[in-house]
């Protein structure tokens, strides 16, 4: 019984990490779920066209 509870708790923690749920998100359910943990970290979006162009160069 004790091992089953420990296994279920470990699986729950693993799934929270796998799906990106943090303790802050669980503590504040009204927070924006799409906002990252550091919204001011990178104000410029990634230019996917430039990334694709750089990736195509070595591939031909």
Swiss-Prot record:
It is found in: Secreted; Target cell membrane. GO terms for biological process: defense response to bacterium; defense response to fungus; innate immune response; killing of cells of another organism. Keywords: Amidation, Antibiotic, Antimicrobial, Fungicide, G-protein coupled receptor impairing toxin, Immunity, Innate immunity, Mast cell degranulation, Membrane, Repeat, Secreted, Signal, Target cell membrane, Target membrane, Toxin. GO terms for molecular function: toxin activity. The modification Leucine amide is found at residue 59. It comes from the Eukaryota. Coiled coil: none annotated. The keyword Membrane applies. Expressed by the venom gland. GO terms for cellular component: extracellular region; membrane; other organism cell membrane. Residues 1-27 form the signal peptide. AXPX repeats lie at residues 27-30, 31-34, 35-38, 41-44. Residues 28-45 form a propeptide. Antimicrobial peptide. Shows activity against both Gram-positive and -negative bacteria, as well against fungi. Also promotes moderate mast cell degranulation. Does not show hemolytic activity on rabbit and human erythrocytes. Its mast cell degranulation activity may be related to the activation of G-protein coupled receptors in mast cells as well as interaction with other proteins located in cell endosomal membranes in the mast cells. Belongs to the MCD family. Mastoparan subfamily. This is Mastoparan-VB2. It comes from Vespa bicolor.
């Amino acid at each position: 019984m004790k091992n089953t509870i420990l296994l279920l708790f470990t699986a729950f923690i693993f799934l929270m990490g796998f799906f990106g749920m943090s303790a802050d998100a669980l503590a504040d359910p009204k927070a924006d779920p799409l906002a990252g943990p550091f919204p001011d970290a990178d104000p410029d979006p990634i230019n996917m066209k430039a990334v694709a162009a750089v990736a195509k160069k070595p591939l031909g």
